[in-house]
From Swiss-Prot:
Transmembrane portions of the chain: none
Gene Ontology biological-process annotations: acute-phase response; regulation of immune system process
GO cellular component, one term: extracellular space
Subcellular localization: Secreted
Protein name as catalogued: Alpha-1-acid glycoprotein
Major location category of this protein: secreted
Phylogenetic placement of the source organism: Eukaryota, Metazoa, Chordata, Craniata, Vertebrata
Domain notes: Contains a beta-barrel that binds various ligands in its interior.
Classification via Pfam families: Lipocalin
Keywords, ordered alphabetically: Acute phase, Disulfide bond, Glycoprotein, Secreted, Signal, Transport
The keyword Glycoprotein appears for this protein: yes
Length: 202
């Protein structure tokens, strides 16, 4: 899945290590509170990503479009995820969860008996966020970008591009999704109708 995949990919990269005050400001990782989790609640779209590793880029190119829902569970320090991803013109659905490490400002998921960690970067625009790894000169740096709408404003995009520049990746290396290629609309609608019926019955 786009979100869970990015968590796994980015977790293989070194953690944040700012090289300049400007980049440090952009890449500040803050503790995660209940308010932070509430900000992440709702529907999000996977906008794009950039990775130096060719294998990761190949995987990113396979994702034509993706969106997901996050549901906070404060007491459990986790986010329930419902993710819809379009690959080869087909919809792939997955339900899982992401663990929250509040003090470190990190997210994690367990895959193949291994826990994968990434840093959460909340945007100053609030309705976008990024998952990021290091820009410390390794060949595997990377960032993924998410927004609450399938299209972002120029200001939101600029913040993403500034982070990309900080980690030493060219703008031409960014791989964007295309919401017009989404094939998950019908399944999402079906799930919404099922949840509505369950709510009415309870």
């Amino acid at each position: 899945m786009a979100l869970l995949w990015a968590l796994a990919v980015l977790s293989h990269l070194p953690l944040l290590d700012a090289q300049s005050p400007e980049c440090a400001n952009l890449m500040t990782v803050a503790p995660i509170t209940n308010a932070t989790m509430d900000l992440l609640s709702g529907k999000w779209f996977y906008i794009g990503s950039a990775f130096r590793n060719p294998e990761y880029n190949k995987s990113a190119r396979a994702i034509q479009a993706a969106f997901f829902y996050l549901e906070p569970r404060h007491a459990e320090d986790k986010l329930i995820t419902r993710e819809y991803q379009t690959i080869e013109d087909k919809c792939v659905y997955n339900c899982s969860f992401i663990k929250i490490y509040r003090q470190n400002g990190t997210l994690s998921k367990v895959e193949s008996d291994r826990e994968h960690f990434v840093d959460l970067l909340l945007s100053k625009h609030f309705r976008t966020f990024m998952l990021a790894a290091s820009w410390n000169g390794t060949k595997n740096v990377g960032v993924s970008f998410y927004a609450d709408k399938p299209e972002v404003t120029q200001e939101q995009k600029k913040e993403f591009l500034d982070v990309i520049k900080c980690i030493g990746i060219q703008e031409s290396e960014i791989i964007y999704t295309d919401e017009k290629k989404d094939a998950c609309g019908p399944l999402e609608k079906q799930h919404e109708e099922e949840r509505k019926k369950e709510t009415e019955a309870s």
